[in-house]
Amino acid sequence: VDMEELAYDWEPWFKELIPMTGGPPSHDTFNRVFQLMNPTLFETCFRAWTEQIRKALPESVEIIAVDGKCCCGSRNGVNSPIEVVNAWASENRLILGVLATEGKGHEIKAVQDLLKGLVLSKSVVTTDALNCQRETAAVIVDSGGDYVLALKRNQPLMHQEFKLFLDEICQSALPGVETADKGHGRIETRRYWQSEDIGW
């Protein structure tokens, strides 16, 4: 339905490009076309198209947020809901890629597969704590990017080691930054320190 509404909203512009003697296609027509598409081929074409858009934009460091999502309304009585991972270039508001996972618990591999297909030079990739994995970091670096990976208690050993490392840093003379934000019914205070010592 959204595609049909978009076609009507942009009908004058579309008519400059293609003849639409019967008006824009209905949502049923869009549905039939999408059902006939090869998803893998569409993904390849979509990535090539977004890469061309990225090349046309002014060069700067790009923040790419990678996350998994559950598609609302995709569950039925038999099948689990569709799970996808996507890469979002936040400043340019551009989806760089979307990949369906093989179900719950397969997000890590899907994120790595998605990242392998992207050009990440001059990019900083951010992920949630689930994707704080050595293999994910290696894929990002191999593709020419940098990364910021969240670390939480879902990896208790790494979390404890890193906490001990940070306790030492915080007690040293290393300068830090503190921010406070109010939202979602709470006040969040964040403290930041940076160290180039990754040997811990």
Residues of each region from the PLM?
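Conserved, well-structured functional cores that handle cations and Mg-NTP chemistry
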Residues: 1-127, 132-135
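A short alpha/beta connector and helix-capping loop motif
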Residues: 80-84, 134-153
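An anionic, glycine-rich sequence signature occurring as long contiguous blocks
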Residues: 152-200
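Alpha-helical structural signal in soluble globular domains
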Residues: 117, 135-143, 161, 165
